[in-house]
Amino acid sequence: MAAQKINEGLEHLAKAEKYLKTGFLKWKPDYDSAASEYGKAAVAFKNAKQFEQAKDACLKEAVAHENNRALFHAAKAYEQAGMMLKEMQKLPEAVQLIEKASMMYLENGTPDTAAMALERAGKLIENVDPEKAVQLYQQTANVFENEERLRQAVELLGKASRLLVRGRRFDEAAISIQKEKNIYKEIENYPTCYKKTIAQVLVHLHRNDYVAAERCVRESYSIPGFNGSEDCAALEQLLEGYDQQDQDQVAEVCNSPLFKYMDNDYAKLGLSLVVPGGGVKKKAAAPPQAKPEGTAAPAAEEEEDEYAGGLC
């Protein structure tokens, strides 16, 4: 079966080459027919699991379409070549071709297809190169935002934010989450704004920036329904505990269902949050115990006793 498909692919390649040849009576190559044959060859090689040959056929198809000024079809062929590279586990190269395809989709005036291609590329590379995936998701969000498809845009920004948090790139994560929050506010999804405020505060506290965290909460009072919500109350309690270096209070808030059932990356931020100094709030000192006669008191106690009766 595989051998048959390989032979079939080779036959289509040969036909494509003939369509590209010129002669005395044929002055111009037939790019359209050649592209069609290259496409058929790619399918045959793919079915035979000869992905290298399939990729090469896709690239030749793309060039033929470009020469024929058929940008959309050229982009499709480049995207298919990228998918063949994916099958070969050559993910960075695959993403490069899919990015090229997306730029051609944009040039052709099909931004939706461009955005879908970029998102697909992000998913491919996410586990191998999270930094590249963030870039791709942000590009996708920009495309959707330019098309005023804000719900799709904010979904992709959310993916980028979570990857930034996972990579502990907190400065960038704070900016990304703020963009999400702005869009959710614009589309009047206020409850999600509250959740994004929690995410912001956790990120800022991991940046050791209490002032920025407090400012996020203060600015959120203008969001309808936030003041008086359980999210607001929990954040005020969290900030109070953090400011007073009360690890117990911080842990209690971060272990509450409101925090634990957030997206996993943010829930982990809560569970790993440590107050400045890293300790539990100081407890009141125990009353001094009576010491038997002749027992030497510690130096610190001697210093205290020296002034026990007040200053003369």
UniProtKB/Swiss-Prot annotation:
Gene3D superfamilies reported for this sequence: Tetratricopeptide repeat domain
Species assigned in the record: Bos taurus (Bovine)
Keyword Protein transport: yes
Region described as Disordered: 281-312
Main location (coarse class): membrane
Record text on subunit structure and interactions: Interacts with RAB11FIP5. Interacts with VTI1A.
Protein name: Gamma-soluble NSF attachment protein
Acidic residues biased stretches: 300-312
Gene from which the chain derives: NAPG
